[in-house]
């Protein structure tokens, strides 16, 4: 009997590794939920499965369009239907996994009308107070710390002049998937932060700067170039944002004052690169870099790590909206998923 499940979790939690392991054991098919992996040419920044992994397991949702081509949630739903048809015809399980909870939410809750974001001077507490008065059904489900949903609620309220929960109930399309079993990888923050830092170091060693240079030269202005990893690389390559010459000069001067001798180890420590990740900066790719060049690369790693950690926090908050899920460690989830598929 055909079965499908969703495996969710924050970025760097190990979703892809676990999904591939289970898919190989059960001869299953994987549908990637990653919003960057849909793009061709974006391999390192998306942490896309490598060639061997793609060859061992049939994947959908990967390398669908070029970076400058349009892709919508509607297109993703079509890809889901292709993946489901393939898996059900082969009578093998379909594992839906990735960090883009928005795609999954649209499929299990229905697709809501697109409403432009309304720029407001109100803070979360003020919007929440309005929601409590106008739409208590919504306010009962979310806290005033949930910036994403509060802004979405207020945008709908201003655009339609209706109670948002009632507007969405009337105008949201029917769910594409019903009764989907959802498994969530739960990782302690300290461990996840270490994984994020290690993955960032590996991305830099793998050549994310070269990948970014190619993308900015060939697809300048494309939407995915504003994503975490590529955005920071673009700033370094073109000396903008956090990598403006004057900012770097001041920071480098401060680092030299902090350390008596500014060697490579002290540069990495200045940017909080952990000792276990030093190896990625001491190999052949960077061993001939001068101190200032390494200083910039270390800052790049620091910024990507910080921004990815912030993304993980947002993903964790968003994933709370998925009800009736099983949340556990990778090891426990592996057992639970195999039990579900048996």
From Swiss-Prot:
Substrate binds at residues 11-16. The record marks 100 as: Interaction with substrate tRNA. Its EC number is 2.5.1.75. The keyword Nucleotide-binding applies. It catalyses: adenosine(37) in tRNA + dimethylallyl diphosphate = N(6)-dimethylallyladenosine(37) in tRNA + diphosphate. InterPro entries: Dimethylallyltransferase (IPR039657), IPT (IPR018022), P-loop_NTPase (IPR027417). SUPFAM superfamilies: P-loop containing nucleoside triphosphate hydrolases (SSF52540). GO terms for biological process: tRNA modification. The keyword Nucleus does not apply. ATP binds at residues 9-16. GO terms for molecular function: ATP binding; tRNA dimethylallyltransferase activity. It comes from the Bacteria. Monomer. Catalyzes the transfer of a dimethylallyl group onto the adenine at position 37 in tRNAs that read codons beginning with uridine, leading to the formation of N6-(dimethylallyl)adenosine (i(6)A). PANTHER family: TRNA DIMETHYLALLYLTRANSFERASE. Belongs to the IPP transferase family. HAMAP family: IPP_trans. This is tRNA dimethylallyltransferase.
């Amino acid at each position: 009997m055909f079965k499908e499940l969703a495996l969710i979790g924050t970025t760097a939690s190990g979703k892809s590794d676990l999904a591939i392991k289970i898919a190989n054991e059960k001869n299953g098919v994987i549908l990637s939920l990653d919003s960057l992996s849909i793009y061709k040419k974006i391999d390192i920044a998306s942490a896309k499965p490598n060639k061997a992994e793609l060859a061992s397991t049939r994947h959908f949702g990967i390398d669908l369009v070029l970076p400058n081509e349009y892709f919508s949630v509607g297109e993703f739903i079509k890809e889901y239907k292709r993946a489901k048809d393939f898996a059900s015809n082969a009578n093998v399980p379909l594992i839906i996994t990735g960090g883009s909870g928005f795609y999954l939410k649209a499929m299990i809750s229905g697709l809501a009308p697109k409403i432009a974001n309304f720029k407001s001077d109100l803070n979360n507490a003020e919007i929440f107070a309005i929601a409590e008065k106008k739409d208590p059904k919504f306010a009962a489900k979310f806290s005033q710390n949930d910036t994403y949903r509060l802004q979405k609620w207020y945008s709908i309220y201003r655009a339609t002049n209706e109670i948002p929960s009632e507007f969405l109930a009337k105008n949201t399309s029917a769910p594409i998937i019903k009764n989907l079993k959802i498994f969530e990888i739960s990782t302690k923050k300290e461990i996840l932060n270490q994984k994020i830092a290690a993955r960032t170091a590996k991305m830099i060693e793998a050549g994310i700067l070269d990948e970014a240079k190619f993308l900015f030269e060939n697809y300048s202005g494309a939407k995915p170039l504003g994503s975490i990893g590529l955005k920071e690389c673009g700033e370094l390559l073109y000396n903008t944002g956090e990598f403006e010459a004057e900012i770097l000069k001041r920071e480098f001067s401060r680092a030299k004052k902090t350390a008596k001798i500014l060697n490579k180890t002290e540069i990495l420590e200045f940017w909080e690169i952990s000792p276990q990740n030093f190896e990625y900066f001491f190999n052949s790719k960077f061993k001939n870099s001068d101190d200032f060049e390494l200083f910039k690369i270390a800052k790049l790693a620091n910024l990507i790590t910080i921004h990815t950690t912030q993304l993980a926090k947002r993903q964790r908050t968003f994933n709370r909206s998925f009800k009736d899920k099983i949340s556990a460690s990778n090891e426990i989830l592996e057992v639970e998923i195999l039990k579900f598929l048996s």
